[in-house]
């Protein structure tokens, strides 16, 4: 198997197969659950809006997809600085049955010089997850832009108890970049290599996936990237990976996240 095919195979096992669109329906989520059981093995998770968690759980149970985690989003997509609302949304997501919660860090507050609210919001949402769900923190690196801010958001999130740090919501102009990945995984290597990393949005093909995995290997070791420490947030990526593995049709034009 070529290196590119190996990267494609690995990326599928690390994927949070995502639909976070305003026009999502029960049927779209059911279809997503079926897609997550790919000819190359299951994706790590699906990522959906909280209201679809019950139908996703029912569907995964029906198709022997119990190993596929259900991730959802809170404080999404704007990363507001109201801690109480973020906590209520996170508690509700866990009550719905989410295995994983991707919460948006209040990145605009950080850009305005407020480091405290981000730390406190992540800490409170981590407490809301309890032992029932892991917490991924979306720092919106493409809007932060400044390497010092990307580093600070990563440090604050990890210090507050994040299980993963994630680049992007997929709802802004600049999503996952190798530059942000380098900064974020450097912070992980310095602070706690058990914390995971999730590039999201903009990872479109096996070549791009391989580049992100390469950064992980260089900074954290060849065996570091597993579903416990690395995820790709993506929707259109899966089609390309299956095509690379000669298990699916060629991708049809540009598709979102």
From Swiss-Prot:
SUPFAM superfamilies per the UniProt record, alphabetical: Aldolase
UniProt-annotated location(s): Cytoplasm
Domain of life: Bacteria
Substrates-to-products reaction catalysed: 2-deoxy-D-ribose 5-phosphate = D-glyceraldehyde 3-phosphate + acetaldehyde
Uppermost EC category: lyase
Pathway: Carbohydrate degradation; 2-deoxy-D-ribose 1-phosphate degradation; D-glyceraldehyde 3-phosphate and acetaldehyde from 2-deoxy-alpha-D-ribose 1-phosphate: step 2/2
Protein EC: 4.1.2.4
Catalytic machinery residues: 102 (proton donor/acceptor), 166 (schiff-base intermediate with acetaldehyde), 198 (proton donor/acceptor)
Family designation: Belongs to the DeoC/FbaB aldolase family. DeoC type 2 subfamily.
Protein name: Deoxyribose-phosphate aldolase
Gene: deoC
